[in-house]
From Swiss-Prot:
Subunit-level organization: Homodimer.
Subcellular location: Cytoplasm, Nucleoid
GO cellular component terms, A-Z: bacterial nucleoid; cytosol
GO molecular function, one term: DNA binding
Lineage, opening ranks: Bacteria, Pseudomonadati, Pseudomonadota, Gammaproteobacteria, Alteromonadales
Described purpose of this protein according to its UniProt entry: Binds to DNA and alters its conformation. May be involved in regulation of gene expression, nucleoid organization and DNA protection.
Chief location bin: cytoplasm
Similarity-based family: Belongs to the YbaB/EbfC family.
Domain of life per record: Bacteria
Listed name of the protein: Nucleoid-associated protein Sfri_2406
Assigned keywords, A-Z: Cytoplasm, DNA-binding
Length: 110
């Protein structure tokens, strides 16, 4: 079933190697920072791979404008940064899993 003697042990070894690689990639993802933008770059939000906002940059010209518009742009920049983080995570995990797809709704890291 597992290719004879040592087959199961070899399978377990491969699973452990993959788990180790995934742990390293997850650490790398957590350290990664992505910047999302809104309003043609007037609002920028930098977020870590753990979805923690590290920095918000607002162009001074927006300080005179409508408060609601500024709030909308900040939210849009946060969403853009989160989307970029998700795309980066998918790419990094696909490298580890050899493109093996996760079931719908299952996110990395577990």
């Amino acid at each position: 079933m597992f290719g004879g003697k040592g087959g199961m042990g070899n399978l377990m070894k491969q699973a452990q190697m993959m788990q180790d690689k995934m742990a390293k990639v997850q650490e790398e993802i957590a350290r990664t920072e992505m910047t999302g933008e809104a309003g043609a770059g007037l609002v920028k939000v930098t977020m870590t791979g753990n979805h923690n906002v590290r920095k918000v940059e607002i162009d001074p010209s927006l300080m005179e404008d409508d408060k609601e518009m500024l709030e909308d742009l900040i939210a849009a920049a946060c969403n853009d940064a989160a989307r970029r983080i998700e795309e980066n995570q998918k790419t990094k995990m696909a490298e580890v899993t050899g493109g093996m797809q996760l079931p719908p709704g299952m996110k990395m890291p577990f």
